[in-house]
UniProtKB/Swiss-Prot annotation:
Originating gene: vhcG
Induction summary: By selenium deprivation.
EC class name: oxidoreductase
SUPFAM superfamilies: HydA/Nqo6-like
Superkingdom in the source lineage: Archaea
Gene3D superfamilies reported in the protein's UniProt record: NADH:ubiquinone oxidoreductase-like, 20kDa subunit
Name of the protein described by the UniProt record: F420-non-reducing hydrogenase vhc subunit G
Keyword Oxidoreductase: yes
EC number: 1.12.99.-
Organism of provenance: Methanococcus voltae
GO molecular function: iron-sulfur cluster binding; oxidoreductase activity
Family note: Belongs to the [NiFe]/[NiFeSe] hydrogenase small subunit family.
Pfam families documented for this protein: Oxidored_q6
Quaternary assembly: The F420-non-reducing hydrogenase vhc is composed of three subunits; VhcA, VhcD and VhcG.
Amino acid sequence: MGKIATTCRGCCSGCHISLIDLHEDLLDILEQVELIHSPVLMDVREIPDDIDVALIEGGVRSGENLHIAREMREEAKVVIAFGTCAVYGGIPGMGNLYSNEELLEKAYKTTITTKNDEGIIPSEEVPALTSRVTPLSQVIDVDYIFQDAPPKPELIASVLTALLEEKEPELSNKNMCEVCPREKSSEGVVVGELKRNYEGEIDPKKCLLEQGYVCMGVATRASCRCFCALVRHVPCTGCYGPTDKVVDQGAKMISALASDYKVDDDKEMNPKELPNKIIDKVGSFYKFTLPSALIPVKNDRNKKII
């Protein structure tokens, strides 16, 4: 019987909730494995020896995160970066746009709901922050990556089952646009304008990018069956991260917009106006992957991890 351990680092524990959302299917998996460590689900502290598979959720945001990640790697035969935060840094990675001092000042002193008359920032017995959020693979060796925020329960089941059967887990290496059934122009995608998500009325059948919405599908791995675009009828935000063919998800999307934007047909819009149409550029293109980008921090903050 295989021994599985899980842990959470710089994250929200949502991937563990998705694991629990397997419901009865989780019982089938637990018949084949022994869950020996999972602080989210069990009252445990010490990391055990001789772990067969370790699932580590979350990126590295503190010295404690780094220590636990290294200890899990030392004790485990196989390490899985579990979820987008572990693989790419996730939404917490947007903190890389600010210094630790700015983040702590905001969190403990200046938010509207904060009551801290003494202006004290916790420091005693609180793990020190690293200088930036870092993906797991940049601090330890990772055997498999397992994206989404959080991964769908059925995907978790398929990956764990494959590993238990000593098979390679199969993850899609196509992007969303390659599998999305929304209708595209026979001439290819041409974007004549850019809208924010609340503007206009979304056509439920037509390509969202052609309608002017910043849909990250062209730069995002197709492992969720285009759930947002087809079920929620909202643009993809890129939570699965890029395919193996893409080095930088945001750069890929910027390149796609530059290629598809309607700048030659009667010069409908000056291409120089394109950046001004995107209100939150980093949040739009790097919401989930900034720490793994070619430029993972603001250039005046480009320091070592600790």
